[in-house]
Structures are given as C-alpha cells and as structure tokens.
Amino acid sequence: MRRISSRLSLVLFAALSCATALFPAHAANPRSVEVDHIAAVVNNEVITARELRERVEQAIHQLNRQGTPQPPADVLERQLLERLVLERAQLQLARETSLQVDEATLERAIARIAESNRLTIAQLQAALEKDGVSWSRFRDNIRTEILLTRLREREVDNRIVVTDAEVDNFLANNADALSGEEFELAHILIRVPEAATQQQMAGLVARAETAKQRLNSGDDFARVAASYSDAPDAMNGGALGWRSRDRLPPLFAEAVRELSPGSVSPVLRSSAGLHIVKLLDRRGGAAAGPQQLEQTRARHILIRTSEILNDSEAESRLLGLRERVVNGASFAELAKAHSADLSSAKGGDLGWLSPGDTVPEFERTMNALKPGEVSAPVRSPFGWHLIQVEARRLQDVSDERKRNAARNALRERKADEAFEDWLRQLRDRTYVEYRTGKE
C-alpha cells in the first residue's frame, strides 16, 4: 500500500467564495423541466438553464474575487456548460456502478475542512451562510467532490503501476529532475477527441493559436484561460501552483527549460490535447545531500468498501479486530485472515516506511502511534486501515529516497495523463445534445 496522492481537496475557500464547489447532479424531475429551459441533454438526464445560470454566477463571483478579467458572456457560458456535461457524465457513471458517500464519511470530511481552517462546525456554517452558501448546498457540494474523487481513484489511480525498470530509466535520463527546483505554472488545455476528424483537429488547432495570439498581444493569461481552457482549473486562471520538475509531465518539463518567468510556451501537443504553458516563477535547485530520516516499521489490515460493504460496516469490522488485538490476538495472524492488501501474506508487514511513502491519512495516524500501539480505524483512498507500529529507526535513505521520489513522480505523471485520457474517452462515448431554444 504505497502512495497514490489523494485527490480530495479541502475546499473551504472555494465554498466561501462560491467558486469551485461542485453542484450536485440530480436527474431532473419533470416538473422542473416544465418551468425551465433545457441547456443540454446528457445521456438520459438534462442540464437546465437554471443550473447553467447558477454555475455562471458562481464563476463570475470567483473571477471577481480573484481580480481576473471576465471573458465574453457567451464564451464563459459555453465553457461552463461543457464542464457541466463532463461532470454529469462522471456522476452518472458513479451512480451506475454503485459508488456512494455515506453520512459518516461526509461528516468526517466536513470536520477536517473546519479543523484545517481553525473553525468549529458551527463557525464554518455561519461563515458559509454569511457568504450566501446554504449549509445543505455546501454538504451536497462536498459529497459530490468526494464521489468524483473516489471515481477517479477507482477508474484511474488504483490501476497505475510503476515498474523498477521505469524507475531506473527515469533516474538515468533525468539527472536534474530531483534537484529540488520548483516551477510555478499556469496552463491552458484544449481537449482533442480521441477520434477527432481532420476538420475538427484544424478547428481546435486554430482555437489554440487564437489563444496564443491573444497572449502574444498582451492579453491577461487568466482571462484567456477562462475563455479557452477545458481544464478544471480554467476559472482559477489555469493555475497549477508550484510543481517540482519531477512532478511535471515530460512535455511541460522540456518546455519550461526554455522559459523565463513571465514567458509563455508555444502550443504543445500531447495525447490529452493542446497546451499552452506560462512560467510564473521558479525557485530552489540545490541538489539534496545525504539524508537521515526517521523510518517506521508498521503492519496494517486493509478492508476495502464495496457494493455490499459500506464505510460504517468496514469501520465496525476493524473495531472488532482491534479489540481482539488489544485482548492478545496476533495482529499478523489477523492480517493474514482479514486484510485485502497484498501485504496480508506477510501478516500485513509494510516494511520500513519513510515520510511520504504512504498516503497522508495513513501517515498521520501511523506517526501518532508509539511502538506496540494499534490505531483506531482510519480511512484512506484505498479503504479502511488498522495500523500497528512495531519500531522506529534513523536511516540514511539518500538512494532510497531518490528511488521513491522517482516512483512517486512517475506514478503521478502516469495518473494525470491516464485521467485526461479517461475523461476524453468518457466524453466521447457520452450522448450529448445541446439545446439553444426553450423546451
């Protein structure tokens, strides 16, 4: 059970600004369709004009807060409608495959959001309502984000495999990738359908070149991103934040070599589509020397949730196993009998773990334990865990850290690329009909 980065962001700022929280996708009921226009049909569901108006108002609120110039109204509406279509297609797939978010999981996520912002639940609710976001809407938004996160984990992240040969090749051919240098980037993505015709491709290339020409003439990057980009971060100016070189797709890593802060790349082509990258800033770059890190020897029992085993039942099952360990049962033997992880054959033994080797939820819980202690059940993107810490040590892990960093970088690269491909394939097989008149 090694690290695949968790995709669930803590979205308090987004919710407070009515910015990026996701609206719940419900099948439209007949009465609402009768009194509202239909903006689009997605498979067997509709997106109403009211939903689209809400999303437009939300985006305008966000752009104003960020001080980002607004794109033309028709462009903004078209961009947001396409995002609603893609979001609805994902949520339909989640429902069809019985993915759910139970109340206990939702309450824990909201508690973490409040805690990370040093608020009580009551203070969080008051802050949201002061800014015009109802508590029920906020809860629905968080539930939707968790659901989309779990869908990505199941369909993409959990299927990513990085081999030792790939790690060796990465280290041999990317000598400067682990130097510690970081880049602050923004980007524009124009998705290209998998089976795009020559005419479609020409139109998309023309769209990318138009965006580039606007940038060359001095137009604001955030405004152009909001007008042209198909990426989820388009309404945030296309901001990717700070990324180390090893976390960048090879296409971006090569492009930033030629850029100085403030400059913009030419139009780039990848399997996901067409890209324009802006280098906002760069920092760091000193190579890391020998590292002594505290490592933890741990075991765990993993219970995965499924259509027939929900979160509450998985947690309850682990509580029962924990009680047996406290009463003298062998953790290793229980792991062999009950754990769904590959480590079960070794009694749940994960070996010596360095910081960053496991997902944050697991690591935080493990770090709070003393040798010999057993945790309460904890949830991660992989399922529910019971963790036992056996020992700790200081270890020179310079070479091991390089390999782990390379493996994590490759995993994130492959996951991001696979997710973009998966989204494109999902969109291509989704029936979509756009409506412009009243229905």
Curated annotation (Swiss-Prot):
Domain PpiC: 180-281, 293-391
One Pfam family from the record: Rotamase
Catalytic reaction list: [protein]-peptidylproline (omega=180) = [protein]-peptidylproline (omega=0)
Annotated protein name in UniProt: Chaperone SurA
Domain remarks in the Swiss-Prot or TrEMBL record: The PPIase activity resides only in the second parvulin domain. The N-terminal region and the C-terminal tail are necessary and sufficient for the chaperone activity of SurA. The PPIase activity is dispensable for SurA to function as a chaperone. The N-terminal region and the C-terminal tail are also required for porin recognition.
Top-level EC class: isomerase
Keyword Isomerase: yes
